[in-house]
Design a protein with these regions (language model features):
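Short, charged/polar, Gly/Pro-enriched secondary-structure boundary elements
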Residues: 209-214
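Short C-terminal beta-strand
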Residues: 200-208
Length: 222
């Protein structure tokens, strides 16, 4: 029992970690917009508040619906695109039956952020990110693919397991995400990373569970 409590506490701690640089960059971007486009600054403030509200909710819950996760991604992207207009494009391919699936918070947002931070170094155009979510037997298959510069071969086997220092960060986000996934679901759900000079794909499998099923079980047990 005590071991499980410690495990749950560690998972919630990992979920609660927010990149302070993102927060300060977002505030600086909004501050710069206040005088030249106050309406856009207002919209970005709403997105920023939504982003951090989701972070607080994620720290309390081990799972959220895929739909809420995609809203979190949208809030994050609106802030990044305000900093770097027209720098990248994101495409979604989401199976309809997956919308109500329960997943650990921030999975897709972290993978998208990782692509934006690391894949497109010094490249301002033709940057694409593809988010795919589909059913694979009893699992939810999640993948984020970019057409960036790829990961060096000497780092590929350790990313997600060991902190890798680079000019754009330490790579802790993938390490923490991998710990969360394996802590919740076991090694079957560990991150799978494939990379070449034409881009990188990070994927994982999560046991499928519907939010409708959970609500039904809760109502039955009352």
């Amino acid at each position: 029992m005590q071991g499980q409590l410690l495990k749950d506490a560690e998972i919630k701690s990992l979920q609660a970690q927010v990149n302070p640089h993102f927060f300060f960059n977002a505030i600086n971007t909004i501050s710069a917009l206040v005088r030249i486009d106050s309406e856009k600054a207002r919209r970005l403030l709403i997105q920023l508040s939504q982003f951090f509200r989701s972070n607080l909710n994620g720290a309390r819950n081990n799972t959220i619906t895929l739909q809420k996760e995609l809203q979190q991604v949208a809030a994050y992207l609106s802030l990044e695109q305000a900093r770097y207009p027209n720098r990248f494009n994101i495409h979604y391919q989401i199976d309809d039956q997956c919308q109500d699936a329960l997943i650990p918070p921030f999975i897709i947002q972290i993978l998208v952020e990782n692509s934006i931070k690391h894949a497109f170094k010094n490249r301002k155009v033709n940057n694409h990110i593809d988010v795919n979510v589909s059913m694979k037997q009893d699992y939810l298959s999640i993948s984020v693919q970019d057409n960036g510069q790829g990961i060096p071969a000497d780092q590929l086997d350790i990313i997600g397991y060991t902190t890798v220092t680079s000019t754009t960060g330490t790579g802790n986000a993938l390490v923490n995400l991998n710990k969360r996934l394996t802590g919740l679901f076991g090694t079957t759900s560990a991150l799978n990373i494939k990379s070449s000079q034409s881009g990188t794909t990070v994927s994982c499998l999560i046991p499928y569970k519907s939010s409708k099923e959970e609500h039904f079980n809760e109502s039955v047990n009352r």
